[in-house]
Amino acid sequence: RLSLVGSEMCIRDRYNRKGFGVLPRAVVWGLLGMGINMAMIVFSKGVPQFMEYMGMENASSIINGEFCLDKLWVALAISVTMNTIFAPVFMTFHKITDTHILDCGGSLRSLVTPIPMTRIITHLNWDAQWNFVFKKTIPFFWYPAHTITFLLPGEVRVLFAAILGVVLGVLLAIAARKK
């Protein structure tokens, strides 16, 4: 996601290193951004519908109305649902594409070379993916951050989510420097 952009803003030497692949990453980030946009639409429409099915009246109109506690509840439900169902798969796929770009030396060739999914998935650092990416960033950053996102008007949600990605990247880069 754009968290990588934020971290790269803090660690400039990394993206200047041969093989980082700024151009292929930009293409992948664009495609991933469309995936995030799709997920935000699907979950922001589907979760309120499900809440209505389960008995909450007017959840679909509440999420698009003025701020109130019910709107906060619906926004939290959308965020938790989206980040529990979609984010782990999305984050893992993002890691796979980053690894593939690095494995191809950062060249544009990475965009047309088949991704060796089995090899990359087998060699992922699942300890870090589970214990940090999933168990820490999702509940402690993305749940609250996307709750705020879904409180905003629909037309600014994707932009705000992109900014949050940059903020997370900056925070992760600062934390990595302190280690």
Label each PLM-derived region with a short phrase.
Residues S7-E8, G165-A176:
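Alpha-helical transmembrane segments and their membrane-interface exit regions
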Residues G21-M34, I63-F86:
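Alpha-helical membrane-spanning segments of integral membrane proteins, especially the hydrophobic core
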Residues G33-M54, A75-L108:
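Transmembrane alpha-helix/helix-exit interface in multi-pass inner-membrane proteins
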Residues V47-L72, G105-P116:
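Membrane-interface interhelical connector segments
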Residues G105-K136:
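Membrane-helix boundary/juxtamembrane motif in polytopic membrane proteins
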